[in-house]
Regions:
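Conserved ATP-binding subdomain of kinase catalytic cores across diverse folds
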Residues: 34-37, 43-55, 59, 65-207
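TRNA-binding/sensing appendages of the translation machinery
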Residues: 1-64
Length: 207
């Protein structure tokens, strides 16, 4: 077991679930068949205190593909509401993103979310399959790092995983996962959700 894998197994924080449980739902990941590492972000790994070489380990591949849930993880999907195409759409939520937990980083022990996109359906998937395909995952992986390089606040991608899992879109494509990392995945719609439900205490808890 690598040092980073041990951190994931033993030292995940789950503060969002424990402190603002109304804002999320428990969920389990659904793994990918025959996962393989496409790319890993060495610069981000170092920022998180991770040896970049650890991202290539078999244990890490199983976690980042959703095949194994770390012992200390309590996976969740976040609920939010908002507008789509200029129209109020009501409740939305993480339809294909699952937050595994938070890691303490640096001397100040800043908590960073570790989230998998494409690891299966959640209570907010509606009629979708909760999957991501390699084509769009490559785009997110590259664009998020480009935005970061331009100084635009964004989530970042730690690694990109391909697989033999078939995902049905306009044609059959290969399923993939992106490991997203951010200090928070709370968005404006997280507050809107409880504003329109007239639950001010939930808004205060989130703030």
């Amino acid at each position: 077991m690598t040092a980073f894998t041990n951190r994931l197994q033993q030292h995940f924080y789950n503060s969002f679930k424990s402190e603002v449980s109304l804002h999320c739902s428990e969920v389990l990941t659904q793994g990918l068949q025959e996962p393989s590492l496409v790319s890993s972000n060495a610069l981000l790994a170092k920022q998180l205190g991770i040896d970049p070489g650890e991202l290539t380990s078999p244990e890490m591949l199983q976690i980042m593909s959703g095949n194994q849930i770390p012992e200390s993880s309590q996976p969740i999907a976040l609920v939010y509401s908002g507008h789509q195409f200029g129209v109020w759409a009501g409740q939305l939520g993480d339809g294909r993103a699952i937050t595994l937990g938070e890691l303490a980083v640096g001397e100040n022990a800043t908590l960073w979310d570790i989230q998998l996109k494409g690891a299966g359906p959640t209570p907010y998937s509606r009629f979708a399959d909760g999957r991501a395909v390699l084509r769009s995952s490559i785009r997110e992986y590259l664009c998020s790092e480009a935005m970061h390089g331009l100084g635009i606040a964004t989530t970042r991608a730690l690694c990109l995983i391909d697989s033999k899992t078939p995902v049905y879109r306009e044609e059959v494509e290969s399923g993939a996962t992106v490991c997203r990392v951010a200090e928070s995945h709370i968005r404006f719609g997280s507050f809107e959700h409880f504003h329109y439900r007239q639950q001010p205490e939930a808004i205060k808890a989130l703030a």
